Amino acid sequence: MKTLSQAQSKTSSQQFSFTGNSSANVIIGNQKLTINDVARVARNGTLVSLTNNTDILQGIQASCDYINNAVESGEPIYGVTSGFGGMANVAISREQASELQTNLVWFLKTGAGNKLPLADVRAAMLLRANSHMRGASGIRLELIKRMEIFLNAGVTPYVYEFGSIGASGDLVPLSYITGSLIGLDPSFKVDFNGKEMDAPTALRQLNLSPLTLLPKEGLAMMNGTSVMTGIAANCVYDTQILTAIAMGVHALDIQALNGTNQSFHPFIHNSKPHPGQLWAADQMISLLANSQLVRDELDGKHDYRDHELIQDRYSLRCLPQYLGPIVDGISQIAKQIEIEINSVTDNPLIDVDNQASYHGGNFLGQYVGMGMDHLRYYIGLLAKHLDVQIALLASPEFSNGLPPSLLGNRERKVNMGLKGLQICGNSIMPLLTFYGNSIADRFPTHAEQFNQNINSQGYTSATLARRSVDIFQNYVAIALMFGVQAVDLRTYKKTGHYDARACLSPATERLYSAVRHVVGQKPTSDRPYIWNDNEQGLDEHIARISADIAAGGVIVQAVQDILPCLH
C-alpha cells in the first residue's frame, strides 16, 4: 500500500491512502454517482471502471463521428470550427481544428497560488469522466479511459487554487488535467503515488503514449464544472461528518451541564415538523438515552433545580430548532451537488439521436457557487452554537457547578484549566462566520471581451469552502476536548470519581472513548482528562484529533449511527 503525497497541500482533511482495492469498484457511465462514491475514489483510492455497456460506448463514438463530420463539412460549431469566446467569429479550417484544441490548453495554462489537495483533483477527474460517458461531448473513449488509468494508478495532476471564475466552467484548472493526460509538455507536473514527476514521464511509466487532441476534445475536457464540483462534493462529505460529530459534542455538553432530555420530546417537534428539526430532536433523544448525567424528564414532569433555572438555556433547549434548518440546508446542497456530479457540463452538446448540436451554458457553476456559499454560512452557524456551549461549560455562573475554565487539579493554584483552549476557539469561530460571507453575488467579472459577462465564482466559493471545512475541523477538535473534560468533572461531582464512562449514555461513551484513545490518555477514576496544565500540550491534542477526523478514524467511526441519516 502506498500513501499518496500531501506535500503540495496544507489541508489535512484531504489526506487519503491509495489502496487499489478492486472489490467494490465505482462504475462510471451506467449509474448515478453519489457524494459517497466521490469520497471513496478521491480519498480512499477505490478503483474505478468505465462501463462496458454497448449502447453507452456506441453513443460516445457517435458523438465523435458527429464532430468529425462537422469538421469535414465545415459546419460552424462553436469551439470546433470557430475560435473561442469573444473570438468565436473567427472561422477555423479543417486543417487547424486539432491545433485549436492543443492551443486551448496552452493559453489556459495560467493557474496561480497553492496547489489543490490531491483528493479534490481526483474527484475532478472522476466527474469529468462521468460527464463524458454521457456521449454528448464528442470526445474519444481513449481520452476518457486515460482518466480511469490515472485514478487507478494514483497519478494526479497538479492544479492550482486560482484561475477559474466559474463561468465557462473551470477552464484554467482543467487545462492542467488535460495537459497531463495527453502528456503535452514536461511543464505539466503530476503526483505519481507520492512522487512528483512531469506528465510525459508519468505516461511512459504507465506504458502510454502522448495523445494529440482531436477537434472538440480540448474544449470538452476544459469547459465544465468538474473541479469546483469535485471540491464541493468533498466539502459536503466532510461537513456531514463534522455535523455528526458536533451532534455528539452537544450530547456530551448537555450531560456535562446536567441538562434535560425533555426539550427533545417528539410532542414538541411534531408541533413544528420541519424535517431537520425532527431529525435533530430524534437524534438527541438517542444520543442521551440511558445517561446517568442527564435529567430524564420525558414524562413531562418538572423538578426545581435548587437555585438553577427550571429549564435549560436556549443553546440546549432550542438545539433542534437551531440545528434543524442547518441540517435541511446541507441536505439540499448535497442534492444539488449530486445532480451536478451526474450532469454534462461542457458546450456545445451533441444530440446524436437527432444529429444536432446545441450551444448552451451548462458550464456555469451557479449551483455550486451558491451551494458552497451556503455551506460556509452553515459551518459558521455550527461553530457559533458550539462556541456558546463552550462558554457555558467554562463559566461557573452558568455551568451548574463545574469548576471555572474546567479546572482539573484545583489544589495547584497556578492551574488555569482550559482558558487558553477557549481563547484559541474564540479566535477560530469569528473566522468561520467571516468565511460564511457569500462570493457568488460579488465582483462581477466582465471577462474575456464581455463574452463571459456573468459568472458564478463557483470555483472560488468551493475553494473557500475547503478552507472553511479545514478550519472547522480544528474547532470541532477543541469542542470535543471541552466536552470530554466537562463530563469527567460532572461525573466526579455526581459519583466522586472521574471516569465518565460509567455515567455517559452508550452513544456518547463511544465518542468519549474515541477521543481519549486518539490523545493517548486512558480514562482513570482519580483524574479527569486534563489534571495539571503542564502535563500535556493541548496543541498536540488538537492536531491529533483533527488528523483522526480527517482520516475517517475512530472518532468518525464513533458517530457512524448518525452519519447514514446525513448522507
Curated annotation (Swiss-Prot):
The keyword Cytoplasm applies. Its EC number is 4.3.1.24. It comes from the Bacteria. It catalyses: L-phenylalanine = (E)-cinnamate + NH4(+). The active site is at Y78 (proton donor/acceptor). Its main location: cytoplasm. Contains an active site 4-methylidene-imidazol-5-one (MIO), which is formed autocatalytically by cyclization and dehydration of residues Ala-Ser-Gly. GO terms for molecular function: phenylalanine ammonia-lyase activity. It holds the Pfam family Lyase_aromatic. Optimum pH is 7.7-8.5. CDD domains: PAL-HAL (cd00332). (E)-cinnamate binds at N223, Q311, R317, N347, K419, E448, N451. Pathway: Phenylpropanoid metabolism; trans-cinnamate biosynthesis; trans-cinnamate from L-phenylalanine: step 1/1. The modification 2,3-didehydroalanine (Ser) is found at S168. There is a cross-link at A167-G169 (5-imidazolinone (Ala-Gly)). Homotetramer. Catalyzes the non-oxidative deamination of L-phenylalanine to form trans-cinnamic acid, the first step in the phenylpropanoid pathway. Belongs to the PAL/histidase family. PANTHER family: HISTIDINE AMMONIA-LYASE. This is Phenylalanine ammonia-lyase.
